[in-house]
Structures are given as structure tokens and as C-alpha cells.
């Protein structure tokens, strides 16, 4: 697939090419970078009818990464060779906590856009799994078949499964 380099191109693909018909006009993807912040850091969100269901920003993400990194370096990964391992684990931990910045959001889209729906559904990256849950290529039967595995899913990812199930009329709205 061709690379999409602009936010408007990414948003267009997510909202028009990939998003299931039942959620079109309801789900909006948002990302921005702030020109006056160092390195143009920013935030990203997924909105449902204008309400941010999932949101995070660089500063929350950065705080979670560095807190976890310093914890790992002072406990289980003390030697110098483990610094890269510690930072990789810290980034993964922060993402599992539902924190990310717009760059992580863009990277997740890049992964999602360049692999099959099957791989996206089982991706290590929770944002990729969310994109897959909202994808038009995920049919109702397969959506229903995911119910058991969703019990083990992160709460903030499972919320998008519920949104999709309700939109498809497969689950009552609470």
C-alpha cells in the first residue's frame, strides 16, 4: 500500500476507507502537534459523536515511559546493556496503560495500513487492535467470535469492541 504522509490523509483512510459503515459519521480520529512546544509534541484522540473515548498526549505518555524506565533500571534491569530493553519495555507499558502521543498514533496507523486485518486483530499494539475492531473488513460473524478473547483485552480496547457491537446491533446499548 502507498504511504500516507499527512494527517488529513491518515484520517481520511481511517474514517472513509477503513471505518465500518455503521460507525461512519460517529467515529472521528483526531491528532495534532503544537508548533510552540518542543519538537512539535501533541496529542491524539478517538471520538464517538464528538466525545473523546480515548485520548492521550505526549506529556502523559512521556511521564509514564520515564517513570517505568527508572523503575526498571533501579530494580530488574540494572546493568548498562539493558537500557534499550528497559526503554522498550517502558514504551510498551505506557501504551498498555492507554497513553500515547500523536507519533505513536501515526506509527500504529502505519502498522495497521500495511498488514492484514487478521494480523491487526492480534497485534501487540493496542491502537492497531482498535483500528482493526472498527474496520469494515471485520464482519459480524467474526466480531461475535471475538467475544471470548475480548474478556482478556485491555479495558480501553474492549470499549471499542462494545462500541462496534452496539453499532452493528449485536449488543444492547446500556
Say what each PLM segment does.
Residues 1-174:
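Alpha-helical scaffold segments
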Amino acid at each position: 500500500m502507498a504511504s500516507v504522509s499527512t494527517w488529513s490523509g491518515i484520517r481520511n483512510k481511517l474514517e472513509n476507507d477503513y471505518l465500518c459503515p455503521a460507525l461512519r459519521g460517529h467515529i472521528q480520529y483526531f491528532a495534532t502537534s503544537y508548533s510552540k512546544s518542543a519538537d512539535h509534541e501533541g496529542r491524539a484522540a478517538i471520538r464517538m459523536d464528538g466525545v473523546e473515548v480515548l485520548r492521550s498526549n505526549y506529556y502523559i505518555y512521556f511521564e509514564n515511559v520515564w517513570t517505568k524506565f527508572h523503575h526498571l533500571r533501579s530494580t530488574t534491569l540494572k546493568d548498562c546493556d539493558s537500557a534499550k530493553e528497559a526503554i522498550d519495555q517502558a514504551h510498551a507499558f505506557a501504551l498498555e496503560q492507554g497513553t500515547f502521543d500523536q507519533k505513536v498514533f501515526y506509527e500504529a496507523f502505519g502498522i495497521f495500513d500495511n498488514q492484514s486485518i487478521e494480523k491487526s486483530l492480534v497485534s501487540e499494539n493496542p491502537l492497531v487492535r482498535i483500528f482493526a475492531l472498527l474496520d469494515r473488513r471485520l464482519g459480524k460473524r467474526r466480531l461475535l467470535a471475538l467475544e471470548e478473547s475480548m474478556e482478556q483485552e485491555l479495558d480501553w480496547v474492549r470499549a471499542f469492541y462494545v462500541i462496534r457491537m452496539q453499532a452493528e446491533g449485536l449488543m444492547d446499548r446500556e
